[in-house]
Design a protein with these regions (language model features):
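Amphipathic, well-ordered alpha-helical segments in soluble domains
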Residues: 7, 11, 34-41, 76, ...
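Transmembrane signal-anchor/signal-peptide helices with a preference for the extracytoplasmic
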Residues: 41-53
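A structural-propensity feature for long, helix-poor, extended segments
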Residues: 50-89
Length: 151
């Protein structure tokens, strides 16, 4: 399933299915993307707004950072599913001979590393959203304060 082009309904249905992907990593990445999108929305709705002239540069920077994180998080949602599938492929490798066992073990170890790196990246960009949300909630358009807080 291409998580980036599926509908929200299909994405959620796929998550609820008997299939192992999308799983927790993809959901965490999607949550990060929506948080960044909310911060970005606050910035976009603060631009050129009367009373917010002194934070225009900060909102521009917020918008750029949030857009970057949003796009990165979306790519990580798909990456999480991809690395999990590669891990499952490694587990399915033959293990009849000593050579096959060594190759399988090496593939599994590499797949573990790859599979661990994606959630680590998701966590790192999710942490960055706290700063964006703080700026959005405290300096952005106050009609959108709840969106900034939820981000």
């Amino acid at each position: 399933m291409d998580l980036l082009t599926s509908s929200v309904k299909d994405f959620v249905a796929a998550t609820a299915s008997k299939e192992p992907t999308p799983g927790g990593g993809a959901i965490a990445a999607l949550t990060a993307a929506t948080g960044a999108a909310l911060a970005e929305m606050v910035a976009n709705l603060t631009f050129d707004k009367k009373g917010y002239e002194d934070v225009q540069e900060e909102m521009h920077l917020l918008q750029q950072k949030a857009e970057f994180i949003r796009e990165k998080a979306l790519s990580l949602a798909q990456a999480d599913a991809n690395v999990f599938n590669l891990f499952m492929d490694a587990l399915a490798l033959p293990k009849n001979t000593d050579e096959e066992k060594l190759a399988r073990t090496a593939a599994i170890q590499q797949a573990y590393k790859d599979a661990a790196n994606v959630p680590l990246e998701i966590g790192m960009i999710s942490y960055e959203i706290f700063d964006l949300a703080y700026v959005a909630a405290t300096k952005g358009n106050q009609n959108l304060i709840t969106d900034g807080i939820i981000a």
